[in-house]
Amino acid sequence: MNFVSAQLPDNEERRAEAVERTGLIDSNQASLFNIYCELAKDITGYEAVLFQLFDSKERCYLAEIQPENNETQNLNTRRPKEGSVCAHVLLDTKPLIAFDVTKHEITKTHSNEKGVKSYIGFPIIDKNNYALGMVCMMTFSKIKELSQDKIDLVEKLIKKAAHQIDVMSDQKQLTSDRLINALDIFNQETNINDMIVFKNFIHVCNKMDVSKDFEKILIENNLCTIDSKSKLELTYKGKKIQDSMGLHTKIMNNI
């Protein structure tokens, strides 16, 4: 019997959009999820752990621990969804548990070129019930069964990872909304429809240096002035616009 690839989830288009909204694939934030791989490995004693998100085309490892390298790595490894056991994990809210991969209905027909002995996969489900990806654990040297307590513990761990993704996605959306609102206010108050000028104005708000060319533009528009120490600072008009935009320093640092 040949291995049967997983069908796409019924909500695949919306699910993939939810993954894209996280902005985590190919980002510099993947290392934030190393701890989940390390804890899962410590709890289970399994030799490999993969923290994966599935976009519309393939699966991407945000973090991974491989047997040949005992440290967590962030290589943004990409693999096909088609033909993978991991894709089956997206189809259920419960973990796929195959302590002996030669006996489980899904895994027993897989080609298993890497010689996996035991496999467990936990879906990463966001607050909107989209399966963004999964965390899987594997052994290669021997079959290793786990107690229900350990399964439950890992499941709670993965739920915490999903919650972290939710929080990060919400913050990302909130920052985007605030920036759009700030840009609208800046355009209305200054009649300057130039994103680069806006960015340099934010730099001044954040006590950062700008080029002489943009100093001149900001001064000409009565947004900035030169203080007694020859430093560029906001005028009264500039400060009013900054207050109207309501951007905090942490958000301005992201621009």
Where are these regions (language model features)?
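Regulatory sensory and allosteric helical modules in signal-transduction proteins
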Residues: 50, 54-60, 70-109, 117, ...
